[in-house]
Amino acid sequence: MAISVDQTPAGKYPAKVHAKRVAARIQELGHGDSGIIYLEGQKTHMIEDSDGEMPFRQRRNFFYLSGCPLPDSYLTYDIKADKLTIFIPPIDPASVIWSGLPLSVEEALEIYDVDAVLSTAEVNASLAHYCSAQGGKKVFAIADQVSPHITFLPFQEIDFDVLKRAVEESRVVKDSYEIALLRRANEISSKAHVAVFKAATSARNERELEAIFVGACMSSGCREQSYHPIFASGTNAATLHYQKNDEDLVDSVTGQRRLNMLIDAGAEYRNYCADITRVVPLSGKFSPESREIYDIVLEMQNSSLAMIKAGVMWEDVHSTSHRVAIRGLLKLGILRSTEEELFEKGISVAFFPHGLGHYLGMDTHDTGGNPNYADKDPKFKYLRLRGPLASGGVVTVEPGIYFCRFIIDPYLSSPDLGKYINADVLERYWSVGGVRIEDNVVVTDSGYDNLTTAPKLPEEIERLATEK
């Protein structure tokens, strides 16, 4: 099913702007205003014990400074001269027979936002020339990403530390071109979610709905998924990153159709990712227990979104989401005690064990989040984004409530923590599995811009699921 969406943003991918941004960050970190930035694209790799190539995925840091998706490529950026050069593979007559003519140097210069395009055979000679022109100064590269045949010997100083940090910090704030790519990925992915909603009541297996999603994305220009899609029915939705996607939607033990399908899936458009989660009732209507949990999670997300703007501490937004979850579970009778005591004891982690969200861009879990996985507070241990939100950053907002026995049972059996959970009331909710709602938003100075258009109001999802 083809999906009609807005066209790709006009003009070239702004590689030169990105190179200047990275160079400025290197200078801010105290490394001067001259030198050569050197990066390599991803190499072609073969499948082990086979003559077939592995699926190719360009190195994100290389693409950020080049806009070039070609394998086996290189780049240099002369900071002082403000000259960005990419090096692309030359024509290999033997390969032309199988794969056709590759991009020429002249064509690449027209396509990419660079100052020069050369053959990969000229990388070392160009490095030596730059070094001579600069008086043998500094080259910046990323450790373990320099090919054995590349030589930096003419340079007086080689820095393998600052470049990776400078690129990853620069990638946090997106420019308008990047946001347009992210919006396109979200538009295509959101409409693919709708296609799944419409097929939910007739599908017989998780893989059928995954196939509908992936097919809708591919027919609209997204050949790759941002990550392995999650199509988790029934209690499978209690597993955060469920991978199988192959179980029947009628339970083999009870003979009953499972309640819901959690869909965590997003397409990758020109190296930029969407990361969207929705839940659809497989009968076309949420069960009472499913609807109660869904409403809590939706309120968790709405409360979080209301807080978002540049400078807000992400930990505060995450804490608010936990408090909303606690209040909702108290109202249902699943939890008992006071909101404050439950928050301090971290009881909500039994039902909401992951972080509220993360930066999004060329990687699903994008750079610059500065997580602290050693945090002793379980509420924050898996929070992939820490600190103040950056204007122009793109974040996921993905609260959830899950009924995972592996996680909850230790709380129930704990002499200290078991008293806070009403096991009798909880029994009614195991079959819900899990509910997560995830949108992708651009942080602005005054609020946010939600890129995700997939419906999330329960009434709208039910309408689409039963639409003929």
UniProtKB/Swiss-Prot annotation:
Functional note: Catalyzes the removal of a penultimate prolyl residue from the N-termini of peptides.
Classification of source organism: Eukaryota, Fungi, Dikarya, Ascomycota, Pezizomycotina
Record's protein name: Probable Xaa-Pro aminopeptidase PEPP
Chain residues that bind Mn(2+) 2: 264, 275, 438
Molecular function terms, GO-annotated: manganese ion binding; metalloaminopeptidase activity
Entries under PANTHER family matching the protein: XAA-PRO AMINOPEPTIDASE 3 (PTHR43226), XAA-PRO DIPEPTIDASE (PTHR43226:SF1)
UniProt keywords, alphabetically: Aminopeptidase, Hydrolase, Manganese, Metal-binding, Metalloprotease, Protease
Cofactor comment: Binds 2 manganese ions per subunit.
Record InterPro entries: Aminopep_P_N (IPR007865), Creatin/AminoP/Spt16_N (IPR029149), Creatinase/aminopeptidase-like (IPR036005), Pept_M24 (IPR000994), X-Pro_dipept-like (IPR052433)
One GO BP annotation of this record: proteolysis
Family matches, as SUPFAM superfamilies: Creatinase/aminopeptidase (SSF55920), Creatinase/prolidase N-terminal domain (SSF53092)
Similarity-based family: Belongs to the peptidase M24B family.
Gene3D superfamilies given in the database record: Creatinase/methionine aminopeptidase superfamily, Creatinase/prolidase N-terminal domain
The keyword Coiled coil appears for this protein: no
Record's catalysed reaction(s): Release of any N-terminal amino acid, including proline, that is linked to proline, even from a dipeptide or tripeptide
This enzyme's EC code(s): 3.4.11.9
Cofactors that this protein relies on: Mn(2+)
Species: Paracoccidioides brasiliensis (strain Pb18)
Gene responsible for this protein: PEPP
Binding site for Mn(2+) 1: 275, 398, 438
